[in-house]
Amino acid sequence: GSALTVRHADTKYKPVSLPPGVIRFQMKRRTMTPILENEAASLFVLNGFAEGVNDLRLVEFHSKANALTDASMEIVAAVSEDHGSGIIIHNDAQHFSAGVDLNAFRNYIERKDWNGIDAFLRRFQDAVCKLKYTPVPVIGAPSGLAAGGGFEVLAHCDKLVVHTNSVMGLVESAVGVVPSGGGIKETYLRWFNETHSWE
């Protein structure tokens, strides 16, 4: 891809420069090789990006619209086991994740494979719960849309560093589905802990 440029007052386009200490993963990714990868997500080791920060793991979703599938959640579950000194879940795509792949759900429904739906949801819930209880810091760094399952992955992170263009939420009811990846529980727990912290 071409470098990001901005037009200056002298009508010349110049490359956008990043402030000191700011790193765009998209630029670094070109020279990195994932330690684990499938058709929907990749797992990278980050070393030397900041002073004293080494052995971080970064998960990047890269399916169509970053829709979450079994393959995506395999990488999320894997990073919970091989977590290094910390985990970052991020990508520089237009959308962090448009949620769970509804085409996969439609296929389950068309086949009347209700056990398949239950098994998928169990795997999704297991992966995000492993992420939540990983003994290292887990940082979610979304940009763009983080809907449904994408939001539910982020809800299980310890901290979020959210881009100003981010739109997040549980949108399942718009398509007639109840959110089932733990996002309702995590949203409630955060709200409860914040509103009752004074007691």
Q: Can you describe what each PLM-predicted range is?
A:
Residues 1-12, 90-95, 140-151, 158-159:
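A glycine-rich phosphate-binding loop feature that marks nucleotide/adenosyl-phosphate handling sites
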